[in-house]
């Protein structure tokens, strides 16, 4: 069924035809009566009428255009960037055929369509095609001839010959001699510009030959570059003839003097070539570039200067031109980095053609490039003054005006030579980047020490450093904020070890490597960042100091901790809401570099706002100076010293000290004398107040978040408590059930080394009170040396308790930590074994074993037995009594040792450890606290090799206790008086030795924690 038209027939016929043509072109349907054609037509009209797309956003389009422009600049496509910028601006500022306004929605809609159709504009090659604008056709109709058609005029005999033909031919003949003689205005002299503007000027009369010649003489530069010898023009001014007078003097003083052929130039020409040289132009006449060195042509002379004087001035300028060429060469190489280019100072060894300069060199190049832009603008202003001829400009005036710039060029060349050119070609990028940043940093500090005389130089170096340090700060920001250490060129001093994944237990120790260079050997070394971060301020021997990026030294530990913490946080499974909130915060976040610049600017503004305060401070300082001067004079007069200058200096010194204390007493450093001197006088304070606080804040945030996550989501504190409960036996009831079952087996002389039996006993004991830890605990037994097995105290050697710690808690509770825990666990087990063996002995057992022989003899031999046992009854009782006393002494010793370790060492140290864990700011600090805690209990339990003799004495006493318990259990009949006496003697010697050693240690004050043990053992010795 055919339709006659759309329901909204108010639309004009032109749109109707366009839509139908669109359907034919896209769908390929030609018959309008076709139902498919009508469906497509209705669909098209519906989308036009009720479209779903938004109106164009002009701000978004301009932001996209600016982003593409910056991308072209970053990719060093400067020609594409310039074309893109110019063409888009021309289009936006040009009216459309049906719209007279500019920058309308139609303009931005067309640009939006083109941007949507574009595909990676930075990767496509583009050469701008010249666009010839249509020029309005001039009216060639000869109105004069038409109007004067019937008039009779005497035109002269040469009416057919144009009166300008001969001059035009002469002008055309001279044009090939023109040259590219300006670095600021390359292809056109001022004459040509003015001549183009005056082509249709009716005031120029070509018939009047003298006027034409004078005009040409005033506006066309004499071709001094043809190197033709010129005659000295004579002037009535004596100073203008100095060169001729000097030549005449030389000729009169030396009859054989023959003047060389020289080219006479004007001072203006010398000035302009000087400006062109400093702007980077290489093809000059007065200055020649030969084998990369700028030299001055020897035959140049001006009328008012001698040849030697002019040459000395120009040679100084040539030296600065050489600096400009060297720096410009570096800029071109970094921008282009073609296969033939080499970095300065690389000699004959070229760099790899595929390796682009790393970002620090690119940032340094960009800083130099921006400096030269402002420098060339200043040179262009001077040349405009010369062209306009408004003021008198001489070579001396130009050199004096450029003196600050020339001194800056000297400083830039020194920094460039030290930081870039003198670096060997095979040096790693990390060393190149750190060396360049250190060179700038040291140069700022060096010129900063000079004071106000070098404020401009320090300001220049500071701006250069701020631009050069941008990639480093961006790398730091990306790492400590997002957890990604992106460093493709490997120029950052910290490198990621990709072989260790994040979820590995060695991630915290072996993931990152800190590169440093020894100043003396210049050899690259690798240090683990764990060592550097854990050592804190300890830098090792003073003879071997390592250099790195100097400005990052105060916050290097915070950067490493924040970066590793953030990467660990990113890999932990956090809640989605937290991730969304972090993403929203990151969208509003400013980068570290931006925050640093804003802080510096606010510091500068604060210095500008404090100008009225400075005046009052100066007045107060003057008054204080007068007071202090009078006081100093009175003190000096007492010593018969009359020196007013010395008094003034003393007074000024006291004032500076008081001013220093006033500034730094409150902790808020504010040294803002002027806006210029803020960065000059206090560069390190500027870093301390503008950069370091932002790094510290991010360090506290991400490390605090990591600690909170580990404590709450991953139960770090609970796992630490579990290690103390089982390894240090703070879970007393649980571990008592476990080790008493083993001790009973040993007392009954039964086999107890079976691993299955040990694990069953451990699971039964732990499962009752700590069911969540029973699956993580296990115990194993390894056979020890047979020599140790002979001693009862070493029968427990080989027992090893294991606790499965999940990731990431195993970063804190590592396998090395569990080894230390096991050493303390074994010592506690040995002490408890001795204590248990003595505790279970009963007095009745020993008495009953003494009476058994009498009961066994029977009544038959009663008289003989009584006769024999009667005289021996008293020695047996004495033997029993001595064994009772020895048991009490051993129990006192073992109980004193047990109480000392369980209360004074483990419990007190554990309370300190819990408090330190709560206050730990980062994971590295927590690891150190845990290691320090283990080291403390390891030392205080006398397990260190240095005090092994004390431990041997204690082990000997424990061994005596176990042997005594075995003998007690065997019965009195197995004892002899000699063995009891020997055991008493051994115990007394060990007891005396330990008391003496411990008392000396306590008196020295080196081991205050041993005081309680020493007093307890002394009490036992007094009882004996």
UniProtKB/Swiss-Prot annotation:
Q: Which GO terms describe its biological process?
A: cytoplasmic microtubule organization; meiotic cell cycle; microtubule nucleation; mitotic cell cycle; spindle assembly
Compositional bias ranges of the Low complexity kind: 531-543
Localization (cell): Cytoplasm, Cytoskeleton, Microtubule organizing center, Centrosome
- Cross-referenced InterPro entries, in alphabetical order? GCP, GCP_C, GCP_C_sf, GCP_N
Give the Basic and acidic residues compositional bias ranges: 189-203
Q: Which GO terms describe its cellular component?
A: centrosome; ciliary basal body; cilium; cytosol; gamma-tubulin complex; gamma-tubulin ring complex; microtubule; spindle pole
Described by its record, this protein's role is as follows: Component of the gamma-tubulin ring complex (gTuRC) which mediates microtubule nucleation. The gTuRC regulates the minus-end nucleation of alpha-beta tubulin heterodimers that grow into microtubule protafilaments, a critical step in centrosome duplication and spindle formation.
This protein is called Gamma-tubulin complex component 5
Species of origin reads Homo sapiens
């Amino acid at each position: 069924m055919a339709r006659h038209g759309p329901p909204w027939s108010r639309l004009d016929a032109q749109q109707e035809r366009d839509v139908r043509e669109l359907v034919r072109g896209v769908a390929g349907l030609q018959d309008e009566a076709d139902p498919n054609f009508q469906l497509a037509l209705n669909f098209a009209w519906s989308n036009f009428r009720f479209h779903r797309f938004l109106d164009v956003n002009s701000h978004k389009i301009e932001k996209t255009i600016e982003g593409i422009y910056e991308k072209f600049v970053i990719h060093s496509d400067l020609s594409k960037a310039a074309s893109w910028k110019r063409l888009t601006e021309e289009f936006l500022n040009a009216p459309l055929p049906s719209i007279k306004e500019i920058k309308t929605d139609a303009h931005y809609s067309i640009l939006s369509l083109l941007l949507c159709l574009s595909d990676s504009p930075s990767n496509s090659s583009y050469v701008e095609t010249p666009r010839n604008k249509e020029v309005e056709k001039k009216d060639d109709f000869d109105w004069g001839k038409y109007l004067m058609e019937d008039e009779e005029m005497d035109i002269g005999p040469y009416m057919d010959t144009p009166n300008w033909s001969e001059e035009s031919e002469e002008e055309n003949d001279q044009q090939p001699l023109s040259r590219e003689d300006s670095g600021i205005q390359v292809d056109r002299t001022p004459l040509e510009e003015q001549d183009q503007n005056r082509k249709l000027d009716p005031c120029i009369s070509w018939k009047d030959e003298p006027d034409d010649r004078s005009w040409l003489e005033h506006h066309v530069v004499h071709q001094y570059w043809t190197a033709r010898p010129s005659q000295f023009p004579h002037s009535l001014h004596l100073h203008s003839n100095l060169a001729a007078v000097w030549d005449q003097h030389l000729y009169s003083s030396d009859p054989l003097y023959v003047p060389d052929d020289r080219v006479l130039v004007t001072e203006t020409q010398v000035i302009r070539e000087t400006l062109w040289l400093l702007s980077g132009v290489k093809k000059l006449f007065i200055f020649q570039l030969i084998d990369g060195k700028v030299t001055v042509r020897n035959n140049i002379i001006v009328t008012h200067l001698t040849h030697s004087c002019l040459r000395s001035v120009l040679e100084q300028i040539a030296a600065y031109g050489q600096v400009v060429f060297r720096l410009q060469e570096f800029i071109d190489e970094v921008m282009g980095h073609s296969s033939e280019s080499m970095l300065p100072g690389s000699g004959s060894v070229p760099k790899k053609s595929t390796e682009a300069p790393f970002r620090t060199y690119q940032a340094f190049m960009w800083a130099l490039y921006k400096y030269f832009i402002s420098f060339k603008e200043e040179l262009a202003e001077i040349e405009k003054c010369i062209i306009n001829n408004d003021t008198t400009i001489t070579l001396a005036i130009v050199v004096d005006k450029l003196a600050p710039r020339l001194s800056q060029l000297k400083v830039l060349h020194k920094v460039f030579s030290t930081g870039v050119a003198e670096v060997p070609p095979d040096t790693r990028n990390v060393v190149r980047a750190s060396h360049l940043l250190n060179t700038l940093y040291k140069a700022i500090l060096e010129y900063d020490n000079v004071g106000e005389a070098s404020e401009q130089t320090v300001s220049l170096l500071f701006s250069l450093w701020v631009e050069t340090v941008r990639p480093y700060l961006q790398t730091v920001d990306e790492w400590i904020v997002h957890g990604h250490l992106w460093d493709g060129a490997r120029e950052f001093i910290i490198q990621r070890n990709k072989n260790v994944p994040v979820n590995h237990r060695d991630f915290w120790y072996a993931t990152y490597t800190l590169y440093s260079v020894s100043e003396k050997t210049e050899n690259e070394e690798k240090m683990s960042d764990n060592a550097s971060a854990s050592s804190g301020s300890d830098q090792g021997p003073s003879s071997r100091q390592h250099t790195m990026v100097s400005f990052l030294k105060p916050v290097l530990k915070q950067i490493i901790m924040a970066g590793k913490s953030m990467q660990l946080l990113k890999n932990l499974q956090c809640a989605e809401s937290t991730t969304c909130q972090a993403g929203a915060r990151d969208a509003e976040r400013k980068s570290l570099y931006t925050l640093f610049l804003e802080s510096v600017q606010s510091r500068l503004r604060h210095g500008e706002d404090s100008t009225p305060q400075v005046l009052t401070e100066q007045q107060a300082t003057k008054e204080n100076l007068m007071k202090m001067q009078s006081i100093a004079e009175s003190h000096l007069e007492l010593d018969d010293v009359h020196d007013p200058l010395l008094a003034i200096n003393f007074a000024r010194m006291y004032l500076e000290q008081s001013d220093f204390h006033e500034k730094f007493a409150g902790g808020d450093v504010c040294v803002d004398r002027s806006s210029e001197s803020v960065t000059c006088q206090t560069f390190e304070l500027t870093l301390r107040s503008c950069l370091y606080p932002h790094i510290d804040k991010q360090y506290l945030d991400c490390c605090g978040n990591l600690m909170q996550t580990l404590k709450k989501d991953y139960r770090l504190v609970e796992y630490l408590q579990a290690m103390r409960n089982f390894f240090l036996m703070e879970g007393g009831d649980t571990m008592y059930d476990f080790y008493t079952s083993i001790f009973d087996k040993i007392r009954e002389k039964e086999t107890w080394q079976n691993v299955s039996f040990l694990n069953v006993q451990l699971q039964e004991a732990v499962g009752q009170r700590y069911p969540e830890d029973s699956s993580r605990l296990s115990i194993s037994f390894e056979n020890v040396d047979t020599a140790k097995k002979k001693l009862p105290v070493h029968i427990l050697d080989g027992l090893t308790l294991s606790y499965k710690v999940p990731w990431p808690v195993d970063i804190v509770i590592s396998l090395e930590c569990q080894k230390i825990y096991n050493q303390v666990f074994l010592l506690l087990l040995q002490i408890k074994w001795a204590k248990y063996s003595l505790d279970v002995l009963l007095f009745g057992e020993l008495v009953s074993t003494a009476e058994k022989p009498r009961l066994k003899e029977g009544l038959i031999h009663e008289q003989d037995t009584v006769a024999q046992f009667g005289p021996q009854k008293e020695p047996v009782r004495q033997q029993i009594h001595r064994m009772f006393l020895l048991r009490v002494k051993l129990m006192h010793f073992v109980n004193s040792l047990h109480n000392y370790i369980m209360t004074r060492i483990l419990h007190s140290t554990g309370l300190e450890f819990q408090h330190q864990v709560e206050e730990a700011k980062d994971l590295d600090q927590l690891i150190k606290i845990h290691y320090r805690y283990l080291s403390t209990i390891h030392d205080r339990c006398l397990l260190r090799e240095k005090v092994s003799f004390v431990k041997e004495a204690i082990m000997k006493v424990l061994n005596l206790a176990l042997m005594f318990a075995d003998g007690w259990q065997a019965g009195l009949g197995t004892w002899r008086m000699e063995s009891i006496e020997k055991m008493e003697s051994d115990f007394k010697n060990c007891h005396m030795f330990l008391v003496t050693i411990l008392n000396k240690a306590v008196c020295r004050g080196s081991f205050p924690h041993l005081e309680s043990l020493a007093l307890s053992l002394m009490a036992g010795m007094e009882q004996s």
